[in-house]
């Protein structure tokens, strides 16, 4: 009887996570009180700058959030996510609007990006963002966050160290436009942030090329894609859904972040 009860609980946990992920997932042996298996990574692969995709992602995050998730990983630098976390606690939109100005000329420059983040703040106010990309906008967003920490007397903190590290990552990437370096760094940064959560499940939103479990980096094709590297480390805890098909007939706004060095 006890074995049957455990089996039923496991099935329930799987069904709950499947709703969050948008597709069936594999079994995990441990579940949280909310019914989501612990230590799971659900990644959505998008075409950047498509309103319908951002709306879909906001809906998927709301489902995850309602079932107990709080940590949302995004294809942004560490310091950008930290600004977003400060904005989540702020009354106004000044921080978000400044970030949006920093994103001018990139795929994040459209109104759909503002709508996405505002929806999350309104519907999922305890969301914690984690940025795992190299340091895009290092001389604007990155420098401003570094200066903010210095003004607050927080130079002897992990926050400050990771900010400087992200800035250096951006400078290294744009100096050589080394896509293999970026892909490996994204995986390393993801692992650092995920392992620090001590078993909590997370959702992530990245470009479609980064979440291919059998893929390689977008341009050089010389190293495994980020998700493939995560799969190697975490095995069946990694789940992906490619939603690029939703943007096949749509025209993204802006230009690729990779073409706007440090801006």
Regions found by a protein language model. Give the residues of each.
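C-terminal motif of bacterial Sec signal peptides marking the signal peptidase cleavage site
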Residues: 16-19
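Compositional signal for N-terminal targeting/processing segments
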Residues: 21-263
């Amino acid at each position: 009887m006890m074995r049957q009860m455990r089996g039923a609980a496991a099935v329930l946990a799987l069904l709950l996570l499947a709703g969050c992920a948008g597709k069936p997932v594999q079994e995990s042996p441990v579940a949280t009180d909310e019914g989501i298996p612990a230590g799971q990574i659900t990644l959505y692969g998008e075409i950047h700058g498509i309103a319908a995709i951002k709306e879909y992602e906001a809906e998927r995050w709301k489902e995850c959030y309602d079932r107990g998730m709080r940590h949302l990983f995004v294809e942004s630098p560490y310091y950008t996510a930290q600004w977003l976390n400060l904005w989540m606690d702020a009354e106004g939109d000044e921080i978000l609007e400044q970030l949006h100005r920093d994103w001018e000329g990139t795929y994040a420059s459209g109104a759909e990006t503002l709508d996405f983040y505002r929806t999350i703040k309104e519907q999922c106010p305890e969301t914690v963002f984690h940025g795992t990309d190299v340091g895009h906008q290092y001389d604007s967003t990155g420098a401003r966050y570094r200066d903010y920490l210095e003004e607050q007397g927080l130079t002897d903190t992990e926050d400050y160290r990771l900010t400087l590290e992200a800035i250096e990552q951006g400078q290294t990437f744009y100096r050589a436009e080394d896509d293999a370096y970026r892909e490996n760094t994204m995986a390393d940064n993801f692992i650092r942030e995920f392992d620090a959560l001590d078993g909590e499940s997370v959702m992530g939103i990245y470009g479609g090329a980064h979440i291919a479990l059998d893929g390689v980096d977008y341009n050089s094709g010389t190293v495994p894609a980020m998700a493939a590297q995560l799969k190697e480390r975490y095995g069946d805890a990694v789940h992906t859904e490619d939603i690029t098909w939703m943007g096949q007939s749509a025209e993204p706004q802006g230009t690729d972040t990779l073409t706007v060095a440090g801006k």
